[in-house]
Regions:
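Sec-dependent signal peptide recognition
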Residues: 2-9
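Hydrophobic h-region of N-terminal signal peptides that target proteins for export
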Residues: 9-18, 28
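Acidic/His- and Gly-rich active-site-bordering loop/insert found
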Residues: 19-125, 130, 134-152
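Structural signal for hydrophobic packing residues in well-ordered secondary-structure cores
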Residues: 29, 36, 60, 64, ...
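Residue-level signal for inorganic ion chemistry
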Residues: 39, 171, 283
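Histidine/acidic-residue-rich, glycine-tolerant segments that coordinate divalent metal ions
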Residues: 112-124, 130-131, 137, 142-143, ...
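Metal-dependent amide/peptide-bond hydrolase catalytic core
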Residues: 236-340
Length: 340
């Protein structure tokens, strides 16, 4: 982790003229790096961001914001009113991933917890949310210090459960834009390993894709591994489904139209000599266009059904395709805002 990452991210949220934001960022960097290391070493899974939210709330209050906690799960909202002017929203995510850290960093996470399914999992900030939160707090500190240089209302949002495509929806359902000032513009960032440190990228138009989560329950007829002819093996069927799904993007989606179909989880069986009754697949889908999203989902349903039929599955054993209602739309950056 290089301090310049934090500095570059912080300056993205600042567009001030009379003062020197860079000098304030440099002043704040030592304490921000300490905060980053603390957050990195203590990650929490989606919907369990208790201590993380408490740390961010404490930092926002120290910067002079009025903070509301436990808003939409472990979400939080900080408000700094500074006279008449536009309302600007700055957002960070809070949650981490069930990933084992192997960086060897002195502040590496050693966290291991039970997930919502009761499984023991390692936890790591592997998607940069620790950097996002640190930049977020630095932005709050600097904007608070420079209140004589701007007018308006600053809304700072800590979004829980971003990795599960759930937290933003929970905050909206809780009345985010009816209980707090509605923003004229929203600013956020995402760190990227594709960019050199010390650089900031701004994308006009589509920047981040739709996100859909799809579960597939592949059913079978269990039995003994020595007598597979007496059952219907869902592991074999699930394997055929995973391979067939790879044709959607490569052979059905127009080249140049971004799309992703990834099978990220497959679970089934308990012992080497037992054919299970069921295998579960978990997929993530990404796209920009509504018609592409629709095509991906329809193709998954078609392929799953066809593979099951070719395996001789009876109607009552057809796989279930479950598309989550918590779909996240694509992020579209207004070109006129990007050029300011």
């Amino acid at each position: 982790m290089k301090p310049i990452h934090l500095a570059a991210s912080l300056l993205l949220c600042l567009h001030l003229q009379a003062a020197d934001p860079a000098a304030l960022v440099k002043e704040q960097l030592p304490s921000l790096v300490t905060l980053y290391q603390q957050l990195h070493a203590n990650p929490e899974l989606s919907m369990h961001e208790v201590e993380t939210a408490a740390v961010i709330a404490r930092e926002l209050r120290a910067a002079g914001l009025e903070v509301t906690e436990k808003f939409g799960g472990h979400g939080l909202v900080g408000v700094l009113k500074n006279g008449e002017g536009p309302t600007i929203l700055v957002r960070t995510d809070l949650d981490a991933l069930p990933v084992k850290e192997q960086t060897g960093a002195p502040y590496a996470s050693t966290k291991r917890v039970k997930d919502d399914l009761g499984r023991d999992v390692d936890v790591m900030h592997a998607c940069g949310h620790d950097i996002h939160m640190t930049s977020f707090i630095g932005t709050a500190r600097v904007l608070s210090r420079l209140r004589d240089q701007w007018k308006g209302t600053l809304i700072m949002i800590g979004q829980p459960a971003e990795e599960r495509v759930l937290g933003a929806r929970l905050m909206l359902r809780a009345g985010l834009f009816s209980k707090f000032p509605r923003p004229d513009m929203a600013l956020a960032l995402h760190c990227s390993s594709d960019m050199a440190h010390g650089t900031v990228g701004i994308v006009e138009g589509y920047a981040l894709a739709n996100v859909d989560s799809v579960d597939i329950v592949v059913k079978g007829v269990g039995g003994h591994g020595s007598m597979p002819h007496l059952g219907k093996d869902p592991i074999v069927l699930a394997s055929h489904i995973v391979l067939a799904l790879q044709n959607i993007v490569s052979r059905e989606v127009r080249p140049g139209d971004p799309a992703v179909v990834t099978v990220g989880s497959i679970h089934g069986g308990t012992k080497s000599n037992i054919i299970p009754d069921e295998v579960r697949l978990q997929l993530t889908l990404r796209s920009y266009k509504t018609e592409t999203r629709r095509h991906l989902i329809e193709s998954i349903r078609r392929i799953v059904k066809a593979q099951a039929e070719s395996a001789g599955m009876p109607v009552e054993k057809m796989p279930e395709v479950i598309v989550s209602d918590d779909q996240s739309p694509a992020l579209y950056n207004q070109p006129e805002l990007c050029t300011k």
